[in-house]
Each structure stands twice: as C-alpha cells, then as structure tokens.
Amino acid sequence: QMSAQQNLFVAQDLESAIVNKDNTVTFNFKAPDAKKVQIAGDFAERAEGQHIGGMVGAGLIDMTKNAEGIWTYTTKPLDSELYSYEFMVDGVPTIDPNNVYVYRDFATTSNVFIVGNGKADLYKVNKVPHGTLAHRWYHSDGMKMDRRINIYTPAGYEQSGNRKYPVLYLLHGMGGDEDEWTTFGRAAQILDNLIAQGKAEPMIVVMPNGHAAMEAAPGESSLGYYKPYHMKNGTMDGAFETYFPEIVKFVESNYRVQADKAHRAIAGLSMGGFHSANISLNYPCLLYTSDAADDLTRVD
C-alpha cells in the first residue's frame, strides 16, 4: 500500500499524444532496450492485408529512437476527429503509459485523443448545459435476468415538471455493449452540444446491451472481472429483438416520455443496425423510424 501510494508522486516528465497548434500530433514512448517500436493508429495509412491486433483499419508506422531511449513520432496535420492508437514494442501491442485516456472495445483496449477545431469539438465537454447519464438495471422476464442499461436525459429534465420527451433507442455494434456509445461514441457530449446549439431536440436516449446472453458490460455484471470474448452465444439469434418491448416498457414506466410511435425512434451501428431493422420489422406499430446505416455516427 505504501509503495502504491508513493507511486502517485513519481514525476511524470514524458508527455504523449500531444496535439500541436498545426493539428499534428506527437507521440513519445520510453523504451531504451527495445529494438523496434511502432505506432498503430486509425490516422495511419493501412498497408494491403495488414491487420493490427484489435485495431480495425489501423496502419503501422515506425517510430524513431533518440539518444535518451525515447521513441518518437509526429503525424502530418490531422482532420478534426477522435482517434485511437496503440504501440507495438518488438511486436507486442502496448498501451501508451503517458496517455491516461484509454477506451475498451469489448476485448481490446486503445489510447485515444481528440483533434479539435472542427466537428470533433462536438465530442468535447464544452461550457453548455449538461444532461444526466444514468446506469440503470431492468428485469427481463424473457431473458430471465436483470440487465444493465444506460439512459441519457437532457439538461433540465429534472426541473421540467410534466414535460414529456421523445426517445431514441441507440444500439451498439458487435464489439460494443451498453457503455460503447457513452465512452468511445461520446454520445452524452454530442447530445449536450447539439441540443445547446439548437441542432437537436431535447430527447431521452436509451442505450441497452445488445448481447442477449450478457447482464452487462465486462466488469459491471455479477461475473466480476473476466476476460471478455468478442461474440457471446445468442447475440444474433433474435432474443434481443424478441424481448425489446421489455426495454420500452421499463423506459415508459420510469421516465416522462411521449409514449407513442411517432416519438419513438431506433437506430444502430453495424450489429445495432441489424437489430434495429429486425425490431422495426417485428414490431411495426412500436417504432417510427429505423436507421441501420453505419454512417449513423456522422455529425457534420
């Protein structure tokens, strides 16, 4: 305990993922004994047939070692966006220890950074009214378990009296869970900013776990800390779609919503788009719209 406490005060001289004024980004990694250090990121060009661990679409770039044993690389100017990356140290995937911002995409982790001065400013916490993100549990009779669900309510919801709100059911992709849209997807920040700018109507956004066999995201369920696997049994067998009305019932029993088809929307990314389409087909009187496209996350 003493040594762990002392570690809090160790000087952290090295910075990494430094966004420079010209929108280039500089990475630093101290590994004096390493023979080769590379950076894999979604900002790098990917060679044909190249696959980097869990990094989808990532390219691989050699870093340069200086006399102090620090490996460094600076990108070309990058577009405004949220980016992810990891290091490859002598072929071993490694998180950047000098950047504490790490996201998990189901079974893989990567560091992230944001280049602003553009559309990615929507991903940032800005000085606007903020909504509330609640981690809730609902009981599924069909799946015979309690399941975790994330629900965003807009700024002012608690003080808005009897006002009722439209609802968006936002579904994640194969590698995600109920936390995906609020971590990597920056859903709460985007909603706060769009609503403040008058570009989105204040709404309630419901983000469930689309893996029917799971209670909750890894580390949040009764299974404790276990090694997650990319695809759980039952993910694509229709159970999530079949019992989706249980989620609607929970939301409409606990929140002030406009409880009619015209004010319920559903959308999803990748697997979530597949689920959205099936739910809309199975329950045509329940939901007004369905967006199964992968470009759902586009905000410009």
PLM feature spans:
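Bacterial Sec-dependent N-terminal signal peptides
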Residues: 1-6
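Non-catalytic cap/lid and distal C-terminal segments of serine-dependent acyl enzymes
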Residues: 19-291, 298
